[in-house]
């Protein structure tokens, strides 16, 4: 039986759906994997040949935002995210989207 998330020391603990437009102005949808590490949380996403890993942050939300910021640096726009899995539990797409304003 797996440990509850509050006891899990390291590894993937959440998956967040990320959607938006890629630098070629094509829509995309991927998963940001949020991992617990010794110093906090970090997120990562793969898009075609690109792997983006955010900085280590103290909260899950900050870890997701770190990935979004890096995607924006690569030219991704109209980005929004929402949690889809907490551990093994599917959230049935009931969570609210978080929209991120484009960089000027």
Can you annotate each of these PLM segments?
Residues 68-82:
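Short arginine-rich
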Residues 3, 59, 77-78:
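Alpha-helix capping and helix-coil boundary motifs
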Residues 46-62:
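A short, exposed loop/beta-hairpin motif centered on an aromatic-Gly-Thr core
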Residues 1-46, 50-51, 87, 99-103:
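N-terminal segment of the canonical double-stranded RNA-binding domain
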């Amino acid at each position: 039986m797996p440990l509850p998330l509050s006891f899990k020391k390291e590894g993937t603990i959440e998956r967040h759906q990320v959607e938006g437009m890629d630098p070629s102005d094509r829509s995309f949808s991927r998963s940001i994997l949020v991992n617990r590490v010794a110093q906090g949380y970090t997120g990562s996403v793969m898009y075609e040949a690109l792997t983006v890993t955010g900085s280590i942050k103290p909260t899950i939300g900050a870890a997701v935002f770190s990935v979004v910021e890096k995607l924006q640096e690569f030219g991704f726009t109209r980005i929004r995210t929402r949690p889809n899995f907490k551990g093994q539990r599917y959230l049935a797409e009931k969570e609210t989207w978080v929209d991120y304003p484009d960089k000027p």
